[in-house]
Swiss-Prot record:
CDD domains: DEADc_DDX27, SF2_C_DEAD. This is DEAD-box ATP-dependent RNA helicase 28. Keywords: ATP-binding, Coiled coil, Helicase, Hydrolase, Nucleotide-binding, RNA-binding. It comes from Oryza sativa subsp. japonica. A motif (DEAD box) lies at residues 347-350. Gene3D superfamilies: P-loop containing nucleotide triphosphate hydrolases (3.40.50.300). Residues 225-399 form the Helicase ATP-binding domain. One of its GO terms (cellular component) is nucleolus. Its EC number is 3.6.4.13. The keyword Nucleotide-binding applies. A motif (Q motif) lies at residues 194-222.
Length: 802
């Protein structure tokens, strides 16, 4: 035990703060994230696959370019480019124009420039037009954030317990939840604490907080830790970077210190949406539990299943997992279960539902004991989150430390306007910005995996140290990229939205949105990677002309914080020329990777065939791996999600797989019922259905003609059959001499509107039927068809009809 550590609960807050500051000066704080163990496995992975890393390919290309003459890279510290960047606040001036400026290479901070020697003006007119323009649209994210705060501090009415339970059950069935009835009162929860000593934590955890450099709890930690220690269910929401991981980790570790140690069991399950976030939470818990005997294991996809199975059989106290892999182990691994689970934690719950894990979450909740503590944490609260809360939590306490869409005050947000003429040079704009202004500790968010990989190659060939993080990499490569960026061995981390949630890397100065995020919520989580825990940070977003609506929504929420950054033409032109010269090397590297991928796939197939021959009996003797949903159910769920997305439904309109199955069975029963009808009724129903479809088509065509929109559409089989029958009827009339001549046809066209399509369909339908089926009211040669005398029941009826 550290002799310098002092436990002095009776001392003043100032003395404790001074002591902790002195301890911090004596010993550097540890980093909570450790991914170094995966770096060695990446080298072994490449050796096993007989492939080379992208960095080796880039170094080979650079060595070849040196022999053949290397393209000139723009210097970021040239004297002629001083004072090239100009930035102004949106609230400074009105009625200006955004004009391309130049980049400031002397300071990383954005300042206002008063030098107008080159005739460059800085303007935010587009931002103001979007704020005050016609037809403004309110952002859904703001409305959701405001709705999520309603009923936050209402107290639950006391009454008969049985009646309350019945009301809750009916609410759950109907999907309507009254916050005042469902959530417990948050009275007594305090969002302020001077030190961790006030939170009733044990000495080992206080030592761990001291080693990590934690001196004062954040608001969500101060409110969550005391309530979690009492075993209450919690629904927590706070801004990104507010310390949610430590908010649920510390009370969990405190409770596990007093567990029955004679019986090992899995007592805590933590679910995260991504593998990187799971690895980060696992590393954080190991750092906080370094002075205890609590064991924790990581269960995510992309890593060895056998190693994870052995770890689960050893019954660790805490399991940090992604939903799919933990369900796989619970169903297919022996001696692995959640019978003794005491705490279930859902981290980044909104992201879990966005990625389609709702069915997996419900299955895990079903497998967990009912008498458990459940904690749910999310940066934003949506309707789907509220539905999940009603299913998994029991009288939870809702804690909202900050507004869900509030960004840190230390964050400086900027916009780089990409004109339509410069969209082809967007990579050059990014390269110029990174060469001159933002040179280290930068996360660049790309929209696609292909774009992120291409940017990695461009940065490498330009002599800039960068790492990539996206779904095309193996899990070891993804974690190695995080470790390299954390150790500052690379200056840039080029990632997709995989890194947009929960990833907390100390010291990130800048976030660049190379591709504009899909909505304001995604923007919030991206820029939340910087300016964390009170530090300063910059967020730069590239906005094209097609992203004006999103820029308007961001500007409305950001207010005067949003600034306009101007990038000069000269450095962009130099970088565009450089990228053009590097295109041959980029295509060569991509071709090498493609060939390696094809070769590796062929080797895998050959190895698989050899193993099937050599170990045939062992392979076929293994039990088949099962899943909680069948292939049919998974297809139905995917189809329902696709239909709801294509129809543009809201979150409340998304149907489940069971509902989709019910609709399919209902349609099947209707078809069977129609099949058993008499032929006459069945044909009548079919004719009515065709008429309704024709009427709807006519209405759509009329609307399109009114709106002036004409689209070329192919003809369906029904239309072809209809036109064919119509032409055959017309030719038959002409053959019989009853058809109209050409002059009559032209006269009819000029005289007025002809019969509608519905009338023509009725006429065709009646002509196909016999006279008997057309009904008694049909006339032939203006004479009613007479019935025979034998068809009447009595002579009096025959006389009356006579």
């Amino acid at each position: 035990m550290d002799a310098d550590f002092r436990f002095d609960p009776d001392g003043s807050d100032d003395d404790g703060a001074a002591a902790s500051a002195a301890a911090g000066r004596r010993k550097p704080a540890q980093s909570p994230w450790e991914f170094s163990s995966y770096a060695e496995s990446v080298a072994a992975e490449h050796a096993r696959r007989r492939t080379t890393s992208i960095d080796e390919k880039i170094s080979q290309a650079l060595s070849g370019s040196r022999r053949g003459g290397k393209p000139s890279i723009p210097d970021g510290d040239s004297e002629g480019d001083e004072d090239d960047s100009e930035v102004e606040d949106d609230s400074e001036e009105d009625d200006k124009e955004v004009v391309e400026g130049e980049i400031d290479d002397e300071e990383d901070e954005v300042e206002e420039s008063e030098d107008d020697d080159e005739g460059v003006e800085v303007s935010d007119e587009e931002v103001e037009e979007l704020e005050e323009g016609k037809g403004e649209e309110k952002s859904d994210e703001v409305e959701e954030g405001e709705e999520g705060q309603d009923g936050e501090e209402e107290e639950k009415e006391e009454g008969d317990e049985e009646a309350a339970e019945e009301e809750e059950e009916t609410d759950k069935k109907s999907g309507v939840v009254d916050p005042s009835k469902f959530f417990a009162s948050s009275e007594g929860a305090s969002f302020h604490a001077n030190s961790f000593l006030e939170l009733n934590l044990s000495r080992p955890l206080l030592r761990a907080c001291e080693a990590l450099g934690y001196q004062k709890p954040t608001p969500i930690q101060a409110a969550c830790i005391p309530l979690a220690l009492t075993g209450r269910d919690i629904c927590g929401s706070a801004i990104t970077g507010s310390g949610k991981t430590a908010a649920f980790s510390l009370p969990v570790l405190e409770r596990l210190l007093f567990r029955p140690k004679r019986v090992p069991a899995i007592r805590v399950l933590i679910l995260t949406p991504t593998r990187e976030l799971a690895a980060q939470v696992h590393s954080m818990i190991e750092k906080l539990a370094q002075f205890t005997d609590i064991r924790c294991c990581l269960i995510v996809g992309g890593l060895s299943t056998k190693v994870q199975e052995v770890a689960l059989r050893s019954m660790p106290d805490i399991v940090v997992a992604t939903p799919g892999r933990i369900i796989d182990h619970l169903r297919n691994s022996l001696s692995v279960g959640l019978e003794d689970l005491a705490i279930l934690i859902l981290d980044e719950a909104d992201r879990l539902l966005e990625l389609g894990f709702s069915a997996e979450i419900q299955e895990l909740i079903r497998m967990c004991p009912r008498r458990r503590q459940t904690m749910l944490f999310s940066a934003t609260m949506t309707e789907e989150i509220n539905e999940l809360v009603t299913l998994s939590l029991n009288k939870p306490v809702r804690l909202e430390a900050d507004p869900s869409l509030k960004r840190p005050a230390t964050l400086t947000e900027e916009v780089v306007r990409i004109r339509r003429a410069r969209e082809a040079n967007q990579e050059a704009v990014l390269l110029a910005l990174c060469l001159k202004t933002f040179k280290d500790k930068v996360i660049i968010f790309s929209g696609t995996k292909h774009s992120a990989h291409r940017l990695k190659i461009i940065f490498g060939l330009s002599g800039m140290k960068a790492a990539e993080l996206h779904g095309n990499l193996t899990q070891a490569q993804r974690l190695e990229a995080l470790e390299l960026f954390k150790k500052q061995e690379v200056d840039f981390l080029i990632a997709t939205d995989v890194a947009a949630r929960g990833i907390d890397i100390v010291g990130v100065r800048t976030v660049i949105n190379f591709s504009c995020p899909r909505d304001a919520r995604t923007y919030l989580h991206r820029v939340g990677r910087t300016a964390r825990a009170g530090r300063e940070g910059y967020a730069v977003t590239f906005v094209t002309d097609d992203d004006r609506s999103l820029l308007k929504a961001i500007a409305k929420k950001a207010g005067s914080q949003l600034k306009s950054r101007i990038v000069a033409e000269k450095p962009v032109a130099e970088c565009a020329k450089l990228i053009e010269e590097l295109e041959d090397q980029i295509s060569t590297i991509i071709q090498e990777e493609r060939e390696e991928r094809i070769l590796r796939k062929a080797e895998m197939e050959a190895t698989k065939a050899e193993n099937m021959i050599a170990h045939k009996d062992e392979i076929y003797s293994r039990p088949k791996r099962t899943w909680f949903a069948t292939e049919k159910e998974k297809k139905l769920l995917a189809k329902a999600a696709k239909e709801s997305t294509s129809q543009g439904k809201s979150n409340s309109g998304v149907i489940s797989a069971q509902q989709a199955e019910d609709l399919r069975l209902k349609e099947k029963k209707r078809r069977e019922r129609e099949k058993n009808l008499p032929r006459k009724k069945r044909r009548r129903l079919e004719a009515e259905r065709e008429m309704l479809e024709d009427e709807s088509e006519d209405e759509e065509e009329a609307k399109e003609s009114k709106g002036g929109k004409k689209e070329k559409k192919g003809q369906s089989l029904v239309d072809v059959a209809y036109r064919r029958a119509k032409s055959m009827k017309a030719s038959g009339k002409r053959g019989a001499g009853t058809g109209k001549g050409k002059n009559d046809k032209k006269a009819k066209q000029h005289s007025g509107k002809g019969p509608t399509r519905q009338e023509e369909m009725q006429e065709l339908f009646q002509n196909d039927m016999s006279e008997w089926k057309q009904g008694r009211s049909l006339k032939k040669n203006n004479v009613m068809r007479k019935k025979s005398k034998n068809s009447f029941k009595s002579k009096s009826r025959y006389n009356r009809r006579k």
